[in-house]
């Protein structure tokens, strides 16, 4: 499932020739996650963004036997029993997981450009007078979301589907996950109901929806991948990258982008808060991080 970007998924597994694109700029990188975000020019003059992430290492004996058989070590230094090398692995183990956003717009470019980050404490009044008007003016297209919900795209990737129009959702892998290493599992639930932008819109009336996503989503993950519910973190982003309610499910050992403090809000915490105070998220000050050039940050300051 696509997360954070607009995309048209056709299910076509044919190779894409990159000769029609040329390098323009490195927007950002993440050395800890071995990721890079590259701005490209296309032959027709439109911009594109390539998100490149090195795949996690395999953990099975067969793969490592093949790696050891087909690899060479290029020496860097040696000191007593300790040696440093560059491991030159076979091509089949050196693929880079990538997502192409094409065509992209200035909002996408700003999203992936490295910037200073700041903490925002958003009061209910701030949300009504600053954040909500910004969302209404600047929401990126949700066509890719509706394509998934309407079975126009990514049908073959659906893990579980609840068809109820009010409390239903679709669970599918996020494009950040290669689908191979379970310790990097990343799937996402998209709610069927339109109009719920984020946790700010949730009330106790939405508890059946949220509990259904949690319970049915975790059961579906266990059935397909064999992972127990205690091995999965389920959370929302606030602010989310797109304003149609969705829930992230990741392996508890995986430090996914934006899964930490001041960005991720646990699904169980949201459920518990709404049970205690039915309109908790309309009354609370919510804390999140924003980039320096983010219009929400500029308006707040």
UniProtKB/Swiss-Prot annotation:
One of its GO terms (biological process) is mRNA methylguanosine-cap decapping. The active site is at 246 (nucleophile). Its EC number is 3.6.1.59. It is found in: Nucleus. A motif (Histidine triad motif) lies at residues 244-248. InterPro entries: DcpS/DCS2 (IPR008594), HIT-like_sf (IPR036265), Scavenger_mRNA_decap_enz_N (IPR011145). GO terms for cellular component: nucleus; P-body. GO terms for molecular function: 5'-(N(7)-methyl 5'-triphosphoguanosine)-[mRNA] diphosphatase activity; RNA 7-methylguanosine cap binding. It holds the Pfam family DcpS. The hydrolytic product 7-methylguanosine diphosphate (m7GDP) efficiently inhibits the decapping scavenger activity and acts as a competitive inhibitor in vitro. Keywords: Hydrolase, Nucleus. Its main location: nucleus. It catalyses: a 5'-end (N(7)-methyl 5'-triphosphoguanosine)-ribonucleoside in mRNA + H2O = N(7)-methyl-GMP + a 5'-end diphospho-ribonucleoside in mRNA + 2 H(+); a 5'-end (N(2),N(2),N(7)-trimethyl 5'-triphosphoguanosine)-ribonucleoside in mRNA + H2O = (N(2),N(2),N(7))-trimethyl-GMP + a 5'-end diphospho-ribonucleoside in mRNA + 2 H(+). Substrate binds at residues 154, 176, 237-248. SUPFAM superfamilies: HIT-like, mRNA decapping enzyme DcpS N-terminal domain. Decapping scavenger enzyme that catalyzes the cleavage of a residual cap structure following the degradation of mRNAs of the 3'->5' exosome-mediated mRNA decay pathway. Hydrolyzes cap analog structures like 7-methylguanosine nucleoside triphosphate (m7GpppG) and tri-methyl guanosine nucleoside triphosphate (m3(2,2,7)GpppG) with up to 2 nucleotide substrates (small capped oligoribonucleotides) and specifically releases 5'-phosphorylated RNA fragments and 7-methylguanosine monophosphate (m7GMP). Belongs to the HIT family. PANTHER family: HISTIDINE TRIAD HIT PROTEIN MEMBER (PTHR12978), M7GPPPX DIPHOSPHATASE (PTHR12978:SF0). This is m7GpppX diphosphatase. It comes from Ascaris suum.
